[in-house]
Amino acid sequence: MMSRKKRRLWIVIACGIGLSTAVALMLFAFRSSLSFFMSPEQVAARHPPPGRVFRLGGIVQANTVVMGTRNGAPYTTFRITDGRASIPVVYTGVLPGLFRQGQGVVTIGAMAKGDSEFMASTVLAKHGADYMPRDVEMALRKAGKWNPKFGPPPNAGAWDDKSPAQIEASNNG
């Protein structure tokens, strides 16, 4: 026969194991619904697996926006940069009215197979003269492209590291 003290200890241990298992299962299930933020530099360094949904934020790189239609739907390609790296983005749908080159955006989507393009399902554009999404602001600070004590974010159009001919060739080829 077990003493009361040992029985109480076993009950506490069993409850602890049960609670730990429940928390672990809950966190595992919750992880699949999370959408992490990444900057273009982080995407280039980490190469997230195709199909994994995450947020990509930065500045729309100058001279990279190409709009058209595909199967009757609006279709847009552009590049998002943080000043250190740029990632090509493909979006099918109507862009927000405030979307333009040199502005901050956050896109939600996943990398396509082959790790070549980010397939965005949602594009969120900057709204307001002084607004900058916090994650984009942190990525720009880390890249050394912006320090808020020196004023508004820099003109992202100055970050264009390709000629228009190179951009057109990379968008079509």
UniProtKB/Swiss-Prot annotation:
Matches recorded under SUPFAM superfamilies: Heme chaperone CcmE
Residues passing through the membrane, by range: 9-29
Entry keyword annotation includes rRNA-binding: no
Summarize where heme binds, as residue positions: 127, 131
Q: Which residues lie on this side of the membrane: Cytoplasmic?
A: 1-8
The principal localisation class reads membrane
Entry keyword Manganese: no
Can you say where in the cell this protein is located? Cell inner membrane
What InterPro entries does the record point to? Answer: CcmE, CcmE-like_sf, NA-bd_OB-fold
Bilayer topology term: Single-pass type II membrane protein
Q: Which GO terms describe its biological process?
A: cytochrome complex assembly
Pfam families, A to Z: CcmE
This entry's Gene Ontology molecular function terms read: heme binding; metal ion binding
Please list the residue ranges that the record places on the Periplasmic side of the membrane: 30-173
Which cysteines pair up through disulfides? They are none
Annotated Gene Ontology cellular component terms: plasma membrane
Query: Which keywords, in A-to-Z order, does the entry hold?
Result: Cell inner membrane, Cell membrane, Cytochrome c-type biogenesis, Heme, Iron, Membrane, Metal-binding, Signal-anchor, Transmembrane, Transmembrane helix
Source superkingdom: Bacteria
Residue span of region Disordered:
145-173
Which family does the entry's similarity section mention?
Belongs to the CcmE/CycJ family.
What does the protein in this record do?
A: Heme chaperone required for the biogenesis of c-type cytochromes. Transiently binds heme delivered by CcmC and transfers the heme to apo-cytochromes in a process facilitated by CcmF and CcmH.
Q: What protein is this chain from? A: Cytochrome c-type biogenesis protein CcmE
Q: Which organism is it from?
A: Acidiphilium cryptum (strain JF-5)
